[in-house]
Amino acid sequence: MTKNLLVELGLEELPAYVVTPSEKQLGEKMAAFLKGKRLSFEAIQTFSTPRRLAVRVTGLSDKQSDLTEDFKGPAKKIALDSDGNFTKAAQGFVRGKGLTVEDIEFREIKGEEYVYVTKEEIGQAVEAIVPGIVDVLKSLTFPVSMHWAGNSFEYIRPVHTLTVLLDEQEFDLDFLDIKGSRVSRGHRFLGKETKIQSALSYEEDLRKQFVIADPCEREQMIVDQIKEIEAKHDVRIEIDADLLNEVLNLVEYPTAFMGSFDAKYLEVPEEVLVTSMKEHQRYFVVRDQDGKLLPNFISVRNGNAERLKNVIKGNEKVLVARLEDGEFFWREDQKLVISDLVEKLNNVTFHEKIGSLREHMIRTGQITVLLAEKADLSVDETVDLARAAAIYKFDLLTGMVGEFDELQGIMGEKYTLLAGETPAVAAAIREHYMPTSAEGELPESKVGAVLAIADKLDTILSFFSVGLIPSGSNDPYALRRATQGVVRILDAFGWHIAMDELIDSLYALKFDSLTYENKAEVMDFIKARVDKMMGSTPKDIKEAVLAGSNFVVADMLEAASALVEVSKEEDFKPSVESLSRAFNLAEKAEGVATVDSALFENDQEKALAEAVETLVLSGPASQQLKQLFALSPVIDAFFENTMVMAEDQAVRQNRLAILSQLTKKAAKFACFNQINTK
């Protein structure tokens, strides 16, 4: 016989960004708890609103499965003394299992007998296990937590109710300072307290109190309501996925509506209007069928349609205040002079240990000079890059960015165009912030890409130089994201810029404001980001590529992919083993690896030396790998017919020199002795 279990935790309003992860975490931990308690079930469904987290388990077995476990103890020679009596070792072993020496039996394993005991545990009724659910609730983790009412414990928000039902049976469990009951809370304004009748009636009991407990249902309600407004007004409404997820976690009973604002505000840049609506007011943007922004917005109310006109007016009033600010800053910022703002950046701190933003820009400008040549920019692109690097942070001192910091770079582009700068300079100022997330959009222009790399590199090197190095999950200055951005941009543009050589060049630069330090740590940090970009590539292949001598990001990623692609082929294992043996022996070479053909003693070493001399890795990574694997028979023949570590020192070093030259070329692809072929 199966049962249905419901657990609901009623809290004060949760931050929207916490709701969905917490709901998922509750479901996962409940499933793990039940499996750990040997309770089978058919399905788990989770629920969440801003004021509750809940989980329902259906088809839950009414008792634990019985458990039979065998435990291996000490060897028989240790378990018995010379008189055949059980020793203290044997007695202690069985006592620890809650058994006696009478339960001991001996089993033979690989010719030797050992103590074994079998312990049987009869499964308990599910009712006896339910109280342990409190530990599941206590185990939930949150990005922030708080104390309340003088209590010593912490939780994401104060807890008001706990409901635990097994079908209709109520459990009055104690959790924090709350005693469980079947009472739950309805909508804050439209509903009231209600009793949940059973685990299966949960959604309907709450629906009567204007609470839609299932977030998927709330999401669909919002989407359907927006689609209805679209059809009614013949408009297009942008349903941004992130905004939708946030809004559904702000409401328990959603009602979407359309509001409007004066069309005069459409003269302000669209990005300002969209930011005001989406980021600050959580409104959806409305466009006509041609994609043109309209003076309307969509909001979602936490409630029904009663007095909706008053709600619309209130939302319009709040938005207009934001738009007034945007219009004012747009008008006033155009009176500013870019060069004056750049000069004022001398008084804006980048970081107290590093210096001003202006000093950061100067260092970035010097880095762009190095990168421009390596990225093979044209003369015009180089000129645009120099101009962009000289002014690219100026918009941080505009009123608009001061009010709407999400628009940094975006407003820089617009103001530079108004000031007569070239489109390339303007675009680079916008693009230098890219990417803004792990999977964020990358710069499209070469000028913007180089400026983005230079800005991020100085940021990384500057913070490392003053000892502000990320550790563990702690990365307050987003240096991992900056490094990931550098790596992604280099890969996307296919620039064959060796990172080790570039970093060496940067450390050779001289600045009045700062001296770069901790180069080794920087290199390890960059390699860790390349490692991350390799994704699910096997660890040994990652290590082989990262240990290689080629630190061109695009080449490294391509090499890793090529190795993974051929790793299941028949010749992979023997080819890698041949190269690996060469790598291991080459480490014994001394001095400069010079090969003297006069010291050859057989045709096989001559053949390998000639093959290595003519080896030039070229083309895509898959082709280079074929070139290396083609040497496998020649390498094998060399090892089969040649004693590398010959007694004659000159002959030995000559043979090691052949292998050293081979591995030097192969290491541009990967260090093959790092690959596991077992």
UniProtKB/Swiss-Prot annotation:
Gene Ontology cellular-component annotations: cytosol
Keywords: Aminoacyl-tRNA synthetase, ATP-binding, Cytoplasm, Ligase, Nucleotide-binding, Protein biosynthesis
Listed EC numbers: 6.1.1.14
Matches recorded under SUPFAM superfamilies: HD-domain/PDEase-like (SSF109604)
Name the UniProt record assigns to this protein: Glycine--tRNA ligase beta subunit
Transmembrane segments: none
Catalytic reaction list: tRNA(Gly) + glycine + ATP = glycyl-tRNA(Gly) + AMP + diphosphate
Family of this protein: Belongs to the class-II aminoacyl-tRNA synthetase family.
Single GO molecular function: ATP binding
Quaternary organization: Tetramer of two alpha and two beta subunits.
Primary residence: cytoplasm
Gene name of the encoded protein: glyS
Subcellular compartments: Cytoplasm
Keyword Cytoplasm: yes
One BP annotation, GO: glycyl-tRNA aminoacylation
Protein origin, superkingdom: Bacteria
A Pfam family recorded for this sequence: DALR_1
